[in-house]
């Protein structure tokens, strides 16, 4: 083979889209589509049509640029097999490693608390409205559900991981089917409520405030950051040796872009379908009831007057069951990450990193007691889920997803080539706006 033929062959090989790229595209997409998506329509539809249209414009840039920034940070380490913790330690020393360990733990643990509240409220709503039984004691319901999940985790972890992987695509398909199924029930209420003469940009219910608060729920819902480190390591091992780091970065960006487009298409279609079926007033009521949008839809169809069609009855029960399955799936997935993070913190600070001083079984037991105990307390207290997301969950995710990569770009020599770009400003602004939600909630 001539030199020119070899170059053409190499270029063709480089430009080709591999099966593994498709697998990772779907993997990133599937990771993001979880229980958090069930709250996005409530916040997005809370302010009516114009704010959700603005969120539609922002959705893809937020999903793509923020995750690409995190991927670039993961790519910047000298070791192709090094995860994000090792990369941060390489750039900022042991202190940086401790910071990233804390960030990962506190980015995931509040999500468990959110899901603890959500699963309790969703089950109680289903019990009372769809099954028609008398209300149960909240503390008992939360304790029962958490003990049930603890039992499954303790005795069937491997089975749980397999079941979780199988549930991703049925859940995505269910969201799409429900979105399509709601089309016959669409109405013009959200359009009729648009009054250009009375629109306000500022103020408590102004467009800018609504979109600002919506950004935090987008950061929370459009989030596959927990898997980005593993994704980058996999792509570096696959591509970097043959094609170099720049090509690997472009390939990762391409995969993240396609995953983000899929995610935005599914979630925004679901949000618009819910909004056209309900109304901004219904979304406000769902927020006040502290339940996911599928539970509210189930109650909405349950309260329909006149003779209900078989389709409406099926949708009523299916919405609640899908919501419960989605929350269980998300809880299990985040529990594993929280357990790993807490085990690491206990080992690092309680046993000075010496794994020989404590057994894995003891570590898991200590971590489970703390995780389940704290989740039960929060579930019993029943704080507003959207407020919890906006004040705790989303800001911590934003600090990891947006601000840490931007700080690394400013400080790390291996990331110097990414300095001075407009997308860095965008990612930084998104991160700061999300974190500033804490200040807004306080005042």
Curated annotation (Swiss-Prot):
One of its GO terms (cellular component) is plasma membrane. The chain crosses the membrane at residues 22-42, 44-64, 97-117, 140-160, 163-183, 207-227, 261-281, 311-331, 366-386, 389-409, 423-443. InterPro entries: Amino_acid_transport_2 (IPR018227), Hydroxy_aa_transpt (IPR004694), Thr/Ser_transpt_TdcC (IPR023726). Keywords: Amino-acid transport, Cell inner membrane, Cell membrane, Membrane, Symport, Transmembrane, Transmembrane helix, Transport. It is a multi-pass membrane protein. It is found in: Cell inner membrane. GO terms for molecular function: L-serine transmembrane transporter activity; symporter activity; threonine efflux transmembrane transporter activity. Its main location: membrane. It catalyses: L-threonine(in) + H(+)(in) = L-threonine(out) + H(+)(out); L-serine(in) + H(+)(in) = L-serine(out) + H(+)(out). Pfam families: Trp_Tyr_perm. Belongs to the amino acid/polyamine transporter 2 family. SdaC/TdcC subfamily. Involved in the import of threonine and serine into the cell, with the concomitant import of a proton (symport system). PANTHER family: SERINE TRANSPORTER, THREONINE_SERINE TRANSPORTER TDCC. This is Threonine/serine transporter TdcC. The gene is tdcC.
């Amino acid at each position: 083979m001539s030199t020119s033929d070899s170059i053409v062959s190499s270029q063709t090989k480089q430009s080709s889209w591999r099966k593994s790229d498709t697998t990772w595209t779907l993997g990133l997409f599937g990771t993001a589509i979880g229980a958090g998506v069930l709250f996005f329509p409530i916040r997005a539809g809370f302010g009516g049509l114009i704010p959700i249209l603005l969120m539609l414009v922002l959705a893809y840039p937020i999903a793509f640029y923020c995750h690409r920034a995190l991927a670039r940070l993961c790519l910047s380490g000298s070791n192709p097999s090094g995860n994000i913790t090792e990369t941060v330690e390489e750039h900022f020393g042991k202190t940086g490693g401790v910071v990233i360990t804390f960030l990962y733990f506190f980015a995931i643990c509040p999500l468990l608390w959110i899901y603890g509240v959500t699963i309790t409220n969703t089950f109680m709503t289903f019990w009372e409205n769809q099954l028609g039984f008398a209300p149960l004691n909240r503390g008992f319901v939360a304790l029962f559900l958490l003990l049930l999940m603890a039992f499954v985790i303790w005795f069937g972890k491997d089975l749980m991981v397999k079941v979780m992987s199988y549930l991703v695509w049925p859940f995505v398909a269910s969201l799409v089917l429900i979105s399509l199924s709601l089309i016959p029930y669409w109405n013009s209420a959200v359009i009729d409520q648009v009054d250009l003469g009375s629109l306000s940009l500022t103020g408590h219910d102004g467009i800018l405030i609504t979109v600002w608060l919506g950004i935090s729920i987008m950061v929370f819902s459009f989030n596959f950051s927990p898997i980005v480190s593993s994704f980058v390591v996999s792509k570096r091992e696959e591509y970097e040796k043959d094609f170099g780091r720049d090509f690997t970065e472009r390939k990762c960006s391409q995969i993240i872009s396609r995953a983000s487009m899929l995610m935005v298409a599914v979630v925004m279609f679901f949000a618009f379908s819910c909004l056209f079926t309900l109304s901004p007033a219904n979304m406000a009521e769902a927020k006040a009831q502290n339940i996911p949008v599928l539970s509210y839809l189930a109650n909405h169809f349950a309260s329909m007057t006149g003779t209900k069609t078989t389709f409406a009855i099926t949708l009523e029960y299916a919405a609640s069951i899908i919501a419960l399955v989605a929350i269980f799936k998300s809880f299990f997935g985040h529990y594993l990450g929280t357990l790993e993070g807490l085990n690491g913190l206990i080992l690092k600070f309680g046993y000075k990193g010496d794994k020989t001083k404590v057994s894995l079984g003891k570590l898991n037991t200590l971590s489970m007691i703390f995780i389940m105990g704290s989740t039960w307390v929060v579930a019993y207290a029943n704080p507003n889920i959207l407020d919890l997301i906006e004040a705790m969950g989303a800001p911590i995710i934003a600090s990891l997803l947006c601000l840490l990569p931007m700080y690394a770009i400013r400080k790390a020599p291996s990331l110097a080539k990414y300095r001075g770009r407009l997308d860095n400003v965008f990612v930084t602004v998104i991160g700061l706006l999300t974190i500033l939600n804490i200040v807004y909630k306080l005042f």
